[in-house]
Amino acid sequence: MSTAAPTAKRRTRDTWTSQTGFLLAAIGSAIGLGNIWRFPGVAYTNGGGAFLVPYLVALLFAGIPILWLEYAVGHKFRGTPPWAFRRMSAKGEFLGWFCVFICFVIITYYAAVVAWSSSYVVYSINEAWGNDSKTFFLSSFLGTVGSDEFSWTPVLAVSVPLLLVWVCILLIVSFGVSKGVEKANKVFLPLLVVLFLALVVRALFLPGALEGLNAFFTPNWSALTDSKVWIEAFAQIFFSLSVGFGIMLTYASYLKKKSNVTGTALVAGFANSSFEILAGIGVFSALGFMAHTQGVAVSELQGLRGPILSFVTFPKIISMMPGGPLFGVLFFSSLVLAGITSLLSLLQVVSGALQDKFAMQPIKASLVMGIPATLISLALFGTRSGLNTLDIVDNFINNVGVVGCAVAMTLFTALVRPRLAGLRRHLNSVSAPAIPPVWDFLVGIVIPAVLTFMLISSLIKSLRNGYDEYATYLVTIFGWGSVAIALIASAILTLVPWSHPQRTSTTPTDQEMA
């Protein structure tokens, strides 16, 4: 394989046009569906206001440090995970591709949730779910089969908007980083914040809102003695910040060489957490109204997290409140925007990796990635089994795939040159504030220990009890199978020779290893 190439074949790697553009994209990636439908319920069931203590500890001592790690690797080695880790050690390329395929699996089902949300924007106008939002969501809309069944029968109400979502996001990514992802985030993220602020303000003035806020913020200090609460806090931070599987590493690789990396990470981290708390205020103000209207306590309400919160509980609230259709349009539009900004970041990891390895232009990489992803997405998540399959894949790809990837990433960067001290020196040479030496201890020992505990706990629970009430064959095929496919695909891509003229050498310079 030649290590040289004609100058004409060389292409300049895309970069963010400004630090602000990068920051908006990073925040847009972090702010996703989980901020709105996961955090409020997790906080409420794990100590209420007291949950903010382990949550902030996790943010400061795990979330921000691992965010700095990804920024350091991406910015220093100027590539997506396969190339960046390969530059550190040839054996690291497999880990890089595992990050890429984790992202690939996630986008296939994440797009389906965005499609649901887009449909519900329209349904909100006339409250199409009627008096029984649960039956409408599970039966009329999704046509969901039993937990022990699987069906290939397509659901047009899902497939059509799902196809449109794919066309939209692939079109954006095909324009590259600066002209596509950056410009889209400059529009979508501010719009998301404006819509969600309007939603929260409306919710705060509903009867019973104060009862909901009291339920959300009243601390149960005894919960702090429960290790499960602390693990939930760390899990929420890892998943909501989009760290541990290459997204932020990829985004940082498009920064200019002179960029304030550490300061941007702090802003992105705290912006994400601020939005989560804002989401908690909005969600529980609305839940307080629901409890007030039904004459029950907030603690008696069901469906306080996940898709059920968004597509069953909130439609009930919308039907109860004055001006409900407008509230519904605001809520589901917020879900669409949050989902799209996160989808773009996941897609860029895959597209960027293909561009790095095969010297593809963004539009070609989008097609090579997008066509199979769209077909898989429609075949698995646009059917009557879509909800069940999504639930299984999401559980395993996050709790096993993402966490396992994060464990491997922290250990790899701690053991392979330039090691953590070298990465810290790199960040401090271009950024402020400076990272203290304790960062090496947190990223090299504390964070891998916490992540390993989370991974082992998930593995033991899954091996002993399966997952929820789903049939064993479904859990095996779609749960363990999704992780296995990511591993196999990673091994195959690692063995494929590099064809990018500027990516043929694995030998890092002395300066890179310093």
Task: Say what each PLM segment does.
Residues 18-58, 211, 247-252, 264-266, ...:
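Transmembrane helix-boundary motif of multi-pass solute transporters/channels
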Residues 10-13, 42-46, 81-94, 98, ...:
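Inter-helical loop and helix-membrane interface segments of multi-pass membrane transporters/permeases
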Residues 17, 24-34, 106, 111, ...:
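Hydrophobic, membrane-embedded alpha-helices of multi-pass small-molecule transporters
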Residues 42-46, 72, 76, 87-90, ...:
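Membrane-water interface regions at transmembrane-helix termini and the short interhelical loops
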Residues 1-37, 66-71, 75-87, 94, ...:
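Membrane-interface "cap" regions at the ends of multi-pass membrane proteins
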Residues 2-16, 20, 182, 186-340, ...:
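Membrane-embedded translocation segments of transport machinery
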Residues 66, 110-136, 193-217, 289, ...:
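Hydrophobic alpha-helical segments and their helix-loop junctions in multi-pass secondary transporters
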